[in-house]
């Protein structure tokens, strides 16, 4: 993703029907929204709709605004938490007032400019009914359940947990990708049914490309790179230096050895000095960096 690319997130928690579900869905949406800000770098780019705010007109307005503000290379995330239903023809996300349909959501998502990569996490019951209709290029779709699975889904809670868990970060790079969060949530759902000695009533699915490269949360020091202006600027400089190093390496075969290393050395020194500045900034923020001078997240 380009250094200047933006990420927008909309998180919606629908009707619970019962107080325990209302509280549960609201809590999950709060956790997802908070973790998502570690990627956007700006909490204002995360829109959370919960309770009476989660009405169809507000969801539509949030998606239209996100589409208008998006450009090719950007990313957009939509997370739906709550109950869904499927009557054999239409999927519906249960919200205050008139429900929003799968067809309605697809029409709104299709308004985004070409080249915007989208992630849709539908963590509701019967969500599988919407998954196939949403499939398309530049779109990753996660459904918590199959279309005929109508029990309250557990997936959303474990998705929220994954975005805040170092356990989900399998490659230990300080970031949680879509694939890592999905694998974590899927595993935890299966373990929960096994622990309850119950038959699994939900089976999630993921469709789309580059799920391993789409970052949905940053952890620890990595989160600071999204939220601290100085670190974010230095990360941009770091990526620029890396590009120069890669360009020099690509020219190695065409350069005399002394000329190649003469050009490479000052760039490597520049990278090392920048790494020291990053480490110093992390120290100011009270974050240990494990002695790494490259500080790449």
Model-identified regions with their sequence ranges:
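Active-site-proximal C-terminal subdomain of hydrolase catalytic domains
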Residues: 30-33, 118-201
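Acidic/histidine-rich, surface-exposed loop or edge segments in extracytoplasmic proteins
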Residues: 7-19, 44-45, 221-228
């Amino acid at each position: 993703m380009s250094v200047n690319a933006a990420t927008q997130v909309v998180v919606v928690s629908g009707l619970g029907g019962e107080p325990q579900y209302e509280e549960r869905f609201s809590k999950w949406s709060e956790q997802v929204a908070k973790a998502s800000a570690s990627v956007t770098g700006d909490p204002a780019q995360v829109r959370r709709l919960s309770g009476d705010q989660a009405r169809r007109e507000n969801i539509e307005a949030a998606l239209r605004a996100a589409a208008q503000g998006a450009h090719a290379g950007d990313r957009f995330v939509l997370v739906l938490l709550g109950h869904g239903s499927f009557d054999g023809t239409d999927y519906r996300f249960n919200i205050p007032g008139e429900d929003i349909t799968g067809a309605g959501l697809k029409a709104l998502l299709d308004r985004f400019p070409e080249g915007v990569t989208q992630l849709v996490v539908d963590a509701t019951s019967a969500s599988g009914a919407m998954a196939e209709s949403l499939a398309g290029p530049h779109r990753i779709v996660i459904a918590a359940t199959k279309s005929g699975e109508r029990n309250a889904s557990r997936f959303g809670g474990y998705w929220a947990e994954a975005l805040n868990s170092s356990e989900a970060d399998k490659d230990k790079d300080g970031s949680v990708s879509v694939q890592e969060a999905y694998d974590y949530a899927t595993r935890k759902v299966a373990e929960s049914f096994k622990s309850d000695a119950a038959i699994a009533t939900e089976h999630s699915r993921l469709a789309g490309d580059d799920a391993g490269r789409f970052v949905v949360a940053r952890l620890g020091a990595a989160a600071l790179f999204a939220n601290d202006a100085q670190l974010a600027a230095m990360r941009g400089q770091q990526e620029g230096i890396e590009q120069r190093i890669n360009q020099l390496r690509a020219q190695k075969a065409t350069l005399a050895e002394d000329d190649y290393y003469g050009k490479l050395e000052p760039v490597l020194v520049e990278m090392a000095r920048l790494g020291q500045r990053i480490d110093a900034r992390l120290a100011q923020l009270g974050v240990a960096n494990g002695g790494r001078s490259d500080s790449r997240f």
